[in-house]
UniProtKB/Swiss-Prot annotation:
Protein name (Swiss-Prot/TrEMBL): Glucose-6-phosphate isomerase
Species in which this protein is naturally found: Nocardia farcinica (strain IFM 10152)
Catalytic residue positions: 359 (proton donor), 390, 516
GO biological process terms, semicolon-separated: gluconeogenesis; glucose 6-phosphate metabolic process; glycolytic process
Gene3D superfamilies attached to this UniProt entry: 1.10.1390.10, Glucose-6-phosphate isomerase like protein, domain 1
One Pfam family of this chain: PGI
Amino acid sequence: MSTLADVSSDITASAAWRKLHDHHGALAQRHLREIFAEDPERGRELTLQVADLHIDYSKHRATRETLQLLVELAREAGVEAHRDAMFAGEHINTSEDRAVGHVALRLPAGRTMTIDGADAGAQVHEVLRRMGEFTDALRSGQWRGATGERIETVVNIGIGGSDLGPVMVHQALRHYADAGITARFVSNVDPADLVAELTGLNPATTLFIVASKTFSTLETLTNATAARRWLVAALGEDAVAKHFVAVSTNAERVSAFGIDTANMFGFWDWVGGRYSVDSAIGLSVMATIGKERFAEFLAGMHAVDTHFATAPLEANAPVLLGLLGIWYANFFGAESRAVLPYSNDLARFPAYLQQLTMESNGKSVRADGTPVTTATGEIFWGEPGTNGQHAFYQLLHQGTRLIPADFIGFARPTDDLPTADGTGSMHDVLMSNLFAQTKVLAFGKTAEEIAAEGTAPNLVPHKVMPGNRPSTTILAPQLTPAVVGQLIALYEHQVFVEGVIWGIDSFDQWGVELGKQQALALAALLTAAEDPAPQDDSSTDALIRWYRAHR
C-alpha cells in the first residue's frame, strides 16, 4: 500500500491507471441499457445507506469491474493512508505546512483529536460553549442593543467561506429558525450588496457579525466599516460594542474596530475557509436555529466522517463518488458536474460546492511542485429542479458534452400544497420529475421507439434521446439540520479523495492571492488626480483610462 511518502508519484504512470485506461477503451461504447440488461439487480445493489442518505450510484457508466478497478486506483494512490493522516492531525496541507482539521469541528463532546500538540476537540467545544451562551442570550432577549431593544436581525459580513457556507445552510434550514431572529448576508464589495441588505433594517435591532480570520480581508472590512458608519450615524459611537461581534483571531484589530474581544469567536489555522461553516463562522446559523439544532447539524457531519474513516473502500460513499468523478474527468473527458437539488431550500448548495470543489482541486501542480499530468478539478454548477429542466437540461439530454449529474431529493417536503385539481401533492409532482429525469438521462429513447409512435420521419432524429448520461441520486427522508451536515461532509470527502489521487494539495488556494495584490495596486490609479503611468499591458491601461473618463 502507498504511504504519504509516495505523494510525489505520478498516479497516471501506475498499473491501476493503465488498467482503467484499457478498461475504458472496452467500455466507452457500451450503453447503460446494455449494462442494466446484463446486471439487472444493480439498481437495488449499487446503493449505499450512509446515516440518513440513500445513495444510488447504479446509473453510472461503470460495471462492477469498473468499480473494482477504481478502488484499486484509490489504494495505489494511498487514499487510506492520506485519510488516516488527516484524522490523525498530520500536516497534509504541505504547501502551508498545516494540519487539515475540519473533521475536529464536529467531534462529539469528550472525543479528542490532537493537532499540533493540543486537544482540538476540547478547543472546539470551548468555542461552541461560548457560541451557545451568546446565541442563547440573543434568542432569549437577554442581549439587548444600545437602546435596550431586542435584536431582531443578524447581518453576517464575510466573503468566500465566511459567506457561502452560512448563506447556504441558513436558507436550507429556514424552517428551523424559531426565535424571531432573521439573518441577512453581505459579501460583495459592490456597495449595492450592503445597501440592499440594510434596506428596511432598524439599527437599534440589528447585530452585525464580522467574519474575517485576520480581520483584514479587503471586502469584509470595507463592508464592515460602511456598516459601522450606518450604525453610528443612527445610534452613536458607543453603540458599536452592542451591535457588532467578530469571528476572528486578531484581537488587536477587533478591539480597534470597537468590538469587545469578549465577543470575538475564534477558529484555527487548520480550518480552511471553505471548510469552516461548522466553526464559529456558523454563528449566524446558530443564532437563527439555536445551539441544539446546530449540534444536530454537526452530528450529521460527524456521522459521514465516521463512515468515511471506517467503511471499506468498496462500500465507502465519498470514496466511490470521488472515484466516479475521476472516472469521468480523466477517462471520459468530462469537464463539469451538475448538482441538481430538487429542493428550493437547497438553491445555494451548487454555489457552495463550487467553492468547496473548485478552490480545493483547481490546481495545475502536484503537492511536490511538479506539473500535473492529467486534468484536475471538476467544474460544479447547477440549479434547483424543476427550474433547470426548463433552462439547461436540453444540453444534458441531447448535447454533445458528457455532464454527469447529482440529483438530490427528499421523501417529505418542508412545505407542501395540493396539486391544481386538489387530489395530489405538489411535492410528489416535484419528485416524479426527479425520477423521470434520471431515467431519461440514463436510458433515453431510440429512433425505433419514436418512429413506432407514428412520429413523422423528418422529426425522428430531432426527438431521439441518446441516454447513456450518468447520474447519482441522493435521497433523504427530509431536509433536516443533520441531513444538511451529511450532504456537506459527503462532498468534502469526495474532494479529498480526488485530490489524493491527483496528488495535489486540496487545502491551499494560492491562485487567489495575486489578483488581490493587483487590485490593491490598481485601486489608487482609478481615482488619482494625475494621469497614471502606463500599465505593463495596453489592455489594462486602456480599461483604466476608460473607467477614469466615465466614472
